[in-house]
């Protein structure tokens, strides 16, 4: 019996360093499952159901400050990109929940005068008042939540269609305590609920986040 055979027999059942390296290399070459972007903390008392919702996190919370002491404004928009047989827009229901942490309990309000760079009103190219009034709810852990359902135009149907929705929000500081510093708040995360009735068929979606980040755009006029 050769020395190599004795060595192999003496260490039967024990992997060699070479075999361990080979196994590690083989494991590294295996296809990895897609990484899931799961937020560190999810709200437990949100008014939206878990099913059918997409948790859209902006990563680092966005902090905005008021330069005139009145309030600040931002624009949140998302694009829906669906493909399916004879999708009816009225079959699609959207909800959003904004998690906002203000520096103190101010008054929230919706704005209806936000326009795009070329002067067109946002939200389907129509005035913002097409959106029903949002309902704000206090959230002890996450500040405040705005919930609304984005309406769609009845009768429109296409096999493939793309529409962009946008919501303009204003944080009003009418209740600012006397002598306090310029108010600010942190824009944390957004819940987006997407629903479609069964007849809409299989759907694919793309959600993008757009925020106004220029101080001039955020000032309330």
UniProtKB/Swiss-Prot annotation:
GO terms for molecular function: RNA binding. Keywords: Acetylation, Capsid protein, Ribonucleoprotein, RNA-binding, T=3 icosahedral capsid protein, Viral nucleoprotein, Virion. The modification N-acetylserine is found at residue 2. Residues 1-24 are annotated as: Disordered. It is found in: Virion. Its main location: virion. One of its GO terms (cellular component) is T=3 icosahedral viral capsid. Belongs to the alphamovirus/ilarvirus capsid protein family. Capsid protein. Binds to the to the 3' end of the nonpolyadenylated viral RNA and is involved in viral RNA translation initiation. Probably binds RNA and plays a role in packaging. This is Capsid protein. The lineage of its organism: Viruses, Riboviria, Orthornavirae, Kitrinoviricota, Alsuviricetes.
